[in-house]
A protein has these predicted regions:
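N-terminal active-site segment of His-dependent metallophosphoesterases
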Residues: 1-72, 82-86, 194-200
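A generic short-segment signal for beta-strand/edge and adjacent turn/coil regions
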Residues: 3-7, 40-45, 117-136, 176-178
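His/acidic metal-ligating clusters that form di-metal
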Residues: 26-32, 146-208
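Structural beta-sheet core signal
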Residues: 38, 74, 206-208
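Active-site glycine-centered loops adjacent to acidic/histidine catalytic or metal-binding residues
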Residues: 40-41, 77, 167
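Generic detection of long, well-ordered alpha-helical segments
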Residues: 48-51, 122-125, 186
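Amphipathic alpha-helical scaffolding segments
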Residues: 52-60, 90-97, 183-186
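Active-site neighborhood of divalent metal-dependent phosphoester bond hydrolases
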Residues: 65-146
Length: 208
């Protein structure tokens, strides 16, 4: 939340309850814990101080579970988007609109591809999540025009492998997500075909 870590923090009890639950229950019930998955909305408004606070909380969680901090895996959500930046940038808004207005997923992928290979500003669509990326890089979960998803591989029994894939569901997310819309008519996310992994024998994919 926006108030996390402030004098009016209303979620402190919830965070303490999570840590207590890990200490008393999770450590005795869960065996061989390999990591923590964070499915987006790490921040409230994509601001650095929010990520600093989140990093400290995740550090406490990893310490309780006895795992390394590098074993945190995260993806961005719409609250990880710096909407204040987008409001000031016609360039970002126009790029997002072009993708959203595509008639087919192939057209959306083509438009997205044009923007991330633009020699003048290939990171345009990733500027709104720059603070997320600064936070996520320490976990190996940063994404940009050169790496639009991240993957991590784990070995399982019987020659099987588990692969995590971190998706980006907020490519076109902005302050317009809920403009004049109710929950039934919320703005649709765009997840391109280039984020969908190909079939691999003896591999189980988990998309986050």
């Amino acid at each position: 939340r926006k108030t996390s870590g402030s004098s009016v923090d209303i979620d402190a009890d919830l965070r303490n309850a999570i840590l207590t639950d890990i200490k008393i229950n999770a450590k005795s019930i869960l065996k061989n814990v390999k990591g923590i998955l964070v499915g987006g909305d790490i921040a409230f408004a994509g601001q650095k101080k929010e990520y600093d606070f989140a990093r400290e909380f995740l550090k406490e969680m990893t310490e309780q579970l006895g795992i390394d901090e590098k074993n945190v895996y995260c993806v961005p959500g719409n609250h990880d988007v710096n909407q204040a930046l987008i409001k000031k940038s016609d360039s970002i808004l126009n790029a997002q609109s072009k993708i959203e207005e595509a008639k087919t997923i192939d057209e959306a992928d083509h438009t997205f591809g044009k923007y991330i290979t633009d020699e003048a500003c290939p990171d345009l669509l990733y500027k709104p999540i720059s603070e997320y990326n600064d936070f996520a890089v320490s976990y190996g979960c940063n994404i940009d025009q050169n790496r639009i998803v991240w993957t991590e591989e784990f070995s399982l029994d019987n020659n099987m492998k588990l692969k995590l894939l971190g998706m980006n569901s907020c490519i076109i997310s902005s302050h317009r997500d809920h403009d004049g819309r109710d929950e039934q008519d919320a703005r649709k996310m765009v997840i391109g075909q280039n984020q969908i992994p190909s079939y691999e024998e003896n591999v189980v994919w988990v998309l986050i």
